[in-house]
From Swiss-Prot:
Catalyses which reaction(s): iminosuccinate + dihydroxyacetone phosphate = quinolinate + phosphate + 2 H2O + H(+)
Natural source organism: Burkholderia cenocepacia (strain HI2424)
Gene behind this protein: nadA
Pathway: Cofactor biosynthesis; NAD(+) biosynthesis; quinolinate from iminoaspartate: step 1/1
Protein name as catalogued: Quinolinate synthase
Signal peptide start-end: none
Amino acid sequence: MQSTIKPVEYDRPVAAGTVCGVGQAWAKVPDAPSAEERAALKARIKALLAREKAVLVAHYYVDAELQELADETGGCVADSLEMARFGRDHDAQTLIVAGVRFMGETAKILSPNKRILMPDLDATCSLDLGCPVDEFSAFCDAHPDRTVVVYANTSAAVKARADWMVTSSIGLEIVADLHARGEKIIWAPDRHLGSYIQKKTGADMLLWQGSCLVHDEFKGIELDLLRAEYPDAKVLVHPESPENVVAQADVVGSTTQLIDAAVKFDAKRFIVATDLGILHKMQLAAPGKTFIAAPTAGNSATCKSCAHCPWMAMNGLANLADVLERGHNEIFVDPAIGERARLPIDRMLEFAAAHKKRVQASGDLQRDQSLFANVGAA
């Protein structure tokens, strides 16, 4: 069962001082520094991280040079929830989040007493943009009999309206559990991930009609042609992709799952349907293997993302150094919203911990593998 909410056009005109649309995001992407500038910026950032007693946490989708810097300085390169957990558990009182705004907010929710800084506060997410809290709250109010489940890629205010927050590592299990208890569900914001979970679980779900700008552009017909060109390649697909792309996957999962698959599969060649930023970590984890980007457009089409998130691309060495030097671009979350938003996050974490214990206690490796066959970390 799906909602009839009209999908959001992310390249619509955006008023100054509100949110950053696709065109504005690409306009704000920093120019690539020269080799000399890059070396100087990295040295400066390392010194500033030490001076500020700060730690850098970066998402798999930001540019390789930022991922390298996080690894080199004792930081973290991970999925969005692991970024927040790492920041929560680290001794540093200042976290530099290289990613998009909802990631900074999630870090602040889990570490309310820490200072959270971001290279550019305009770095947002099409899923977040496409799920305004006022509209979403009205939608929830219109269906009071349903349990509200939201994906991690949402604002703090939307999380505060939810009963559960999920990542793709545990979303199937949580929805299946809710379905087994007879609960009907509102799902937001990604319609493709929601549809994937709905088909796997058979749950009664109303799907908010949001989508990821990057994953929504992957094309099933062109992917089929690419597979014919490389018949030996395994296909790795993020579940935020359209159904006709997911259907061609050898592995469906998100960032951590897809990296693990690249390591564990015996294949030497992979077609990857997710943000190009992940290829850096895949190449490090599986040297000697070849990774091919899945097609985002046909010959006569143009792409808005070309398989790289424009908001992720707004993170660069220069603005990272600047935020450390000036101490600006701090993330704030209203304490009342933060407290409410933490409840669905903690509920998910508790469920995940209990679920992990149940799986480990089963002692059945074949059963365990089937449980995790098509899911990965958020």
